[in-house]
């Protein structure tokens, strides 16, 4: 593998088609498509500020690099990607990629990141300004993520999240096959129109959570006082180790909580309307 060190590039396609190379302490200061249509590319201790630097790349390893504001849409249409210890300021990172591993990386402007991607593993990362994160993506494993941004995981599937903090309005809308464990979720209108969502030992805040959900399961979770009108038109099995402000017209299942401020079963209920609701559950 050839090593390219201590170089500075600008303009369009300065390293187009290069393969089997390692970039060390290089700077892409402007331009676009610095590397494209290559394979087996490594980058370390380098700086990117040109658009679209890594498109159509097979086998990409990036460590201790910085992606500045203009390095937007940096990695698209690529496979087998490993990123670690990076600082990403640019938005729209990762689109239509597969087999992605990201470790200990900070995304300061993560909006529209991880769209239409498959096979994602995230460990010990933070993602801010992250609106529409993981849209339409699948097979996602996450450990220790701090996420700030709305509409995360919309229409995503095959998701497992552990020990994370998710601050995201409308998170998990139309998502399928989701498991979240030991995490904090702050989300208005959480998981509406979702299917097969399981939350275990989670703390949940946000109004009108988990409505129109199919096969929703909560195991020993805590719902904050703001979670009013929960579970409307959802099939749900839930054990809640806290007070619930109100529950409204669940479809079916079984809800057990420490206490419930208001149980609303009114003329707007929908069949089968068979959900069993119990209080005095303490876990």
Regions found by a protein language model. Name each.
Residues 1-283:
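Long, distal/terminal scaffolding or interaction modules
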């Amino acid at each position: 593998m050839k090593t390219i060190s201590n170089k500075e590039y600008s303009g369009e396609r300065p390293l187009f088609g290069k393969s089997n190379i390692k970039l060390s302490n290089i700077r892409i200061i402007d331009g676009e498509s610095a590397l494209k249509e290559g394979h087996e590319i490594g980058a370390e201790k380098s700086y990117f500020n040109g658009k679209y630097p890594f498109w159509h790349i097979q086998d990409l390893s990036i460590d201790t690099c910085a992606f500045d504001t203009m390095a937007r849409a940096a990695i698209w249409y690529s496979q087998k990607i490993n990123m670690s210890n990076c600082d990403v300021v640019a938005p729209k990172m990762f689109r239509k990629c597969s087999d992605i591993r990201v470790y200990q990386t900070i995304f300061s402007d993560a909006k529209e990141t991880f769209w239409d991607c498959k096979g994602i593993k995230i460990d010990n990362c933070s993602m801010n300004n992250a609106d529409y994160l993981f849209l339409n993506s699948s097979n996602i494993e996450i450990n220790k993520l701090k996420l700030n941004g709305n509409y995360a995981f919309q229409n995503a599937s095959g998701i497992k999240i552990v020990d994370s903090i998710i601050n995201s309005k409308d998170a998990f809308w139309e998502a399928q096959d989701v498991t979240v464990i030991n995490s904090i979720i702050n989300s208005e209108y959480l998981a509406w129109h979702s299917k097969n969502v399981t939350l275990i030992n989670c703390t949940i805040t946000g109004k009108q959570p988990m409505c129109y959900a199919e096969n929703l399961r909560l195991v020993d979770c805590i719902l904050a006082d703001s979670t009013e009108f929960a579970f409307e038109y959802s099939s749900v099995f839930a054990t809640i180790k806290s007070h619930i402000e109100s529950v409204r017209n669940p479809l079916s299942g079984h809800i057990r909580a420490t206490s419930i401020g208001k149980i609303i079963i009114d003329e707007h209920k929908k069949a089968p309307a068979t959900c069993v609701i119990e209080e005095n559950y303490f876990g």
